[in-house]
């Protein structure tokens, strides 16, 4: 604010931790697993009325019904050099997850923020909405974002056993 960083900002706090590790000769890397729901335009329900399995995790049919949107998101990540490696239907009806390669923690954090904007924008283009809310539907599993964090010394992952 007023040209100064906000100390309590999550991005500033992450940069400070990265700097602390760097002074000790370490590098922080991370990857995230972003979960989201594809919902109808008014936000009242999931968008795919045929996604009704009682245990829908990894449902390929539901994933393929959203192929054009998932492909477009994935193609955008490829074009930006993110190296996506997994797209799947998650544990709840209407829920999906997309993953890309881990990298420097600040880059991953910035990509995560942009990913949400990109998914929401592309979903709208396809006549849908996307939500990353933790629990948009009381009767379905909620969204999460698993973060995998590692500390490196050169090419050595210090967290390996």
Task: Label the model's feature ranges.
Residues 1-161:
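Glycine-rich, acidic/polar active-site loops that bind/position phosphate-bearing ligands
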């Amino acid at each position: 604010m007023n040209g100064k960083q906000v100390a309590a900002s999550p991005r500033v706090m992450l940069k400070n931790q990265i700097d602390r590790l760097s002074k000790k000769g370490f590098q922080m890397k991370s990857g995230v697993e972003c979960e989201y729901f594809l919902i109808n335009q008014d936000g009242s329900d999931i968008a795919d009325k045929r996604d009704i399995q009682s245990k829908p995790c990894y449902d390929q049919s539901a994933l393929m019904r959203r192929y054009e949107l998932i492909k477009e998101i994935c193609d955008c990540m490829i074009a930006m050099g993110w190296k996506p490696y997994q797209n799947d239907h998650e544990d709840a009806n209407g829920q999906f997850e997309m993953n890309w390669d881990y990298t420097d923690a600040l880059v991953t954090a910035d990509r995560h923020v942009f990913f949400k904007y990109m998914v929401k924008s592309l979903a709208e283009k396809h006549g849908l909405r996307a939500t990353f809310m933790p629990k948009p539907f009381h009767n379905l599993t909620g969204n999460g974002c698993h973060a995998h964090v590692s500390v490196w010394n050169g090419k050595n992952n210090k967290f390996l056993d």
